[in-house]
Amino acid sequence: MIKYCENCGSALTEKLLPTEDRLRLVCDECGHIAYVNPRIVSGTLPVANGRVWLLRRGIEPRMGYWTYPAGYQEIDETTVDAAIRETLEETGLRVAVSRLFGIYSRAGSHVVNVVYLARHVDESATPSLSREALEILSFGPDEVPWDDLAFPSTELVLQDWVSLVRGPEATP
């Protein structure tokens, strides 16, 4: 939870303002309202030949668990730019976005996930490990490591991918 004002450094207090319908963190000194809102995480499902590339996380949180390449969007990026950059940083794969795959959010979560379907720019390229990836493998719809996925959002995204590939009745 945020404790101090980003404008003046004074302590924040929870208040119900006349213009708001919920408690907000307000600075008693300068009146700044500190909104606590989710951040955008952009990622791709790099797909080739009916298989999706996933990485085993090399960093916390959830180090050692599988996810698709993704990360926080920087202020000077679009969601597409961030998704492409994160995929290159984490897997070494140069991708082109095919289309928006989905937007995933949950109440109480600090992130909104924006996920794109992507294809390799160079289909002969192979992924390379990074400080964020312990392992990078491609999985078919019947091979997804469901018990070892990093986040609830990872599971939702991959369930939707399996439904796209196999049809809705095939979702695990």
Model-derived regions: residue spans:
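A short beta-loop-beta micro-motif enriched in histidine and acidic residues
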Residues: 40, 61, 132
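Unchanged
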Residues: 73-96, 100-160, 164-172
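Acidic, metal-coordinating catalytic segment for phosphate/diphosphate chemistry
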Residues: 2-44
